[in-house]
Amino acid sequence: PYDLFLQSVRAHLRLLTVDVFHPSVPREKWLDAQDPKHVAISLNGEPTLYSRLSEFLEICHNHGVSTFLVTNGSLPKVIENLDTLPTQLYVSVDAPNKEIFDRICKPKFDTGAFNKLEQTLELLPSLDTRTVCRHTLIKNESLGHHEDYARLDNIADPMFIEAKGYIYVGNSQNNHTIENMPSHPEILEFSDKLASLTGREVLSDRRESRVALIGREMIPVVLPEKKLDLPSDLGIAKPQNFHLPQV
């Protein structure tokens, strides 16, 4: 886990290898970016499959780095048994009920995947950390169904609910069309109704991202206390060549 953390920072630093004397590069921001403050554990598959996740989280925190863990909720026992919790735990609630969940998410190995998601949501009120339910909303598929979403959100009682419109990019284009993208006004309409059903309000929104944040109040992220510094000879990651598999 420690090597994974260091390699992540090295990869981050490689992205910052720019001409720092160029007038378009704010030197103060470039210097600040040399010492990362946040890490998102997402996008590379389901992170709760990593058997040493707690150790990785603790290493991040000891270096003063906050952790944002995104899970699909398929492994509630892992969440329950984490010795170290992330700074913020996102649970992807991508469908309002089992029927739509099975159609959209297409679980391959577990016919009870939606029940596992519900078990994860039941855990959230007992976790001493920031929690978020994230809804990625697909027009004509999972958008709407406010009562079903509210039932799940009320079980989880998260600090925040994030309503995000589906974006027609990547491999999802094989399963959806551009008509499945909700507009920002549609996201706001959904969020207003969901906020009312969950005793919350719309705290913020971003038109460019077609996203709204629902909650009771804005609560800033507090960085973990920094106990360890990065090695002085850390260096940067070597260049990598990645090739997408041919379809």
Q: Can you annotate each of these PLM segments?
A:
Residues 135-138, 165, 200-217:
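Acidic carboxylate-rich catalytic motifs and surrounding loops in phosphoryl-/glycosyl-chemistry enzymes
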Residues 12-185, 189, 193:
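Conserved AdoMet/S-adenosylmethionine-binding subsite of the radical SAM
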Residues 211-247:
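Radical SAM enzyme core and accessory elements
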Residues 1-4:
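Canonical Radical SAM [4Fe-4S] cluster-binding loop centered on the CxxxCxxC motif
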